[in-house]
Amino acid sequence: MQGLSFTSTAATFFLVLCLQLGINEGQDNETIPQPLLFQLNVPSTPDENQEVDMSLTLQTQYKECLVVKAYLISNTPVDGGFNYIQTRCICNDHPTTLYWTFVVTQTLTFRIMVDIVKDKGICPNNVAVVPISGNRYFTDRTVYVN
């Protein structure tokens, strides 16, 4: 009986060792897809009282679609299109571009916020995912007025 116990213990140890090595190797070689990729176009030096056109292209490396809500925030009040909140469905085979138009009266620092949300009625058949790792992305920009 003792020989059988030693054999099963050795076999179990060998199996666990092989599985552990296989899992570690698989994780090291795999690249993690990014939930959101940004491409932002903002004029850097418009004239005072000039209308600024800003665009933000969003895409995902996920196989599934995401529902995103994008908006701008600033400590300086800005009227017009600056305050629009835009909600879209982003899929890996279809990047989406969002646009904002607003007038700058002074140098303006603002934040572009993109939240991955669970809103229904945006993606086809309401099929979309929210990543566990994080659902809020942002970047800061400054527009310097001449």
Swiss-Prot record:
GO terms (BP aspect): detection of chemical stimulus involved in sensory perception of bitter taste; negative regulation of T cell apoptotic process; positive regulation of gene expression; proteolysis; regulation of immune system process
GO molecular function, one term: identical protein binding
Glycosylation sites: N29
GO cellular component terms, A-Z: apical plasma membrane; extracellular region; extracellular space; nucleus
Membrane-spanning residues: none
Pyrrolidone carboxylic acid found at: Q27
SUPFAM superfamilies, per the entry: E set domains
Subcellular location: Secreted
UniProt keyword Secreted, yes or no: yes
Position of the signal peptide: 1-26
Disulfide feature: C65-C91, C89-C123
Entry keyword Transcription regulation: no
Annotated keywords: Disulfide bond, Glycoprotein, Pyrrolidone carboxylic acid, Secreted, Signal
Pfam families xref list: SVA (PF05326)
Family label: Belongs to the PIP family.
Subunit structure: Monomer. Interacts with AZGP1.
Protein name: Prolactin-inducible protein homolog
Source organism of the structure: Rattus norvegicus (Rat)
